[in-house]
């Protein structure tokens, strides 16, 4: 596999993942705005973590599939930088409980998501 081909595979997957991320933000925007908590970011991080756990075994032997789905799609879908920025904004706005809750929920639920994805893959695949 050539490096240029790998770039295109990852880029195509990243495009798909980024569009999926944007759609989740649009769908969950009203809840996030209404309650002042970044629900969309939490949702994509937990779902992305589950999917990484679920798909890691099936794509481990397929280098093209792994690059497209694991690196591209899920890399473009999950949002650690957005999570970090939103946490800092909450903290800077004096919302210390929401900032702490955001860190706790993202870390805990994403770990649970990966674990559940692994377990679901064992059962389903």
From Swiss-Prot:
Q: Which GO terms describe its cellular component?
A: plasma membrane
At which positions is Na(+) bound? 75, 78
Give TM regions: 7-27, 36-56, 63-83, 96-116
Q: How does it sit in the membrane?
A: Multi-pass membrane protein
Q: Name one GO molecular function term.
A: fluoride channel activity
Its primary localisation, in coarse terms, equals membrane
Which keywords appear in this protein's UniProt record, sorted alphabetically?
Cell inner membrane, Cell membrane, Ion channel, Ion transport, Membrane, Metal-binding, Sodium, Transmembrane, Transmembrane helix, Transport
List locations, semicolon-separated. Answer: Cell inner membrane
Q: Which domain of life is it from?
A: Bacteria
Please provide an example of a Pfam family that matches this protein in its UniProt record: CRCB
Instruction: Note the coiled coil stretches, chain numbering.
Output: none
Q: What does this protein do?
A: Fluoride-specific ion channel. Important for reducing fluoride concentration in the cell, thus reducing its toxicity.
Q: Known NCBIfam families for this protein?
A: crcB
Q: What protein is this chain from?
A: Fluoride-specific ion channel FluC
List the source organism.
Answer: Elusimicrobium minutum (strain Pei191)
């Amino acid at each position: 596999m050539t490096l240029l081909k790998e770039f295109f595979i990852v880029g195509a997957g990243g495009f798909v993942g980024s569009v999926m991320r944007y759609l989740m933000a649009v769908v969950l925007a009203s809840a996030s705005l209404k309650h002042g908590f970044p629900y969309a970011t939490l949702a994509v991080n937990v779902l992305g973590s589950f999917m990484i756990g679920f798909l890691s075994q099936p794509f481990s032997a397929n280098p093209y599939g792994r690059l497209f789905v694991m690196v591209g799609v899920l890399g473009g879908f999950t949002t650690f930088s957005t999570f970090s920025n939103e946490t800092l904004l909450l903290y800077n706005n004096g919302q210390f409980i929401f900032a702490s809750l955001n860190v706790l929920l993202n870390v805990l639920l994403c770990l649970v998501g990966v674990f559940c994805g692994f377990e679901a893959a064992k059962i389903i695949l």
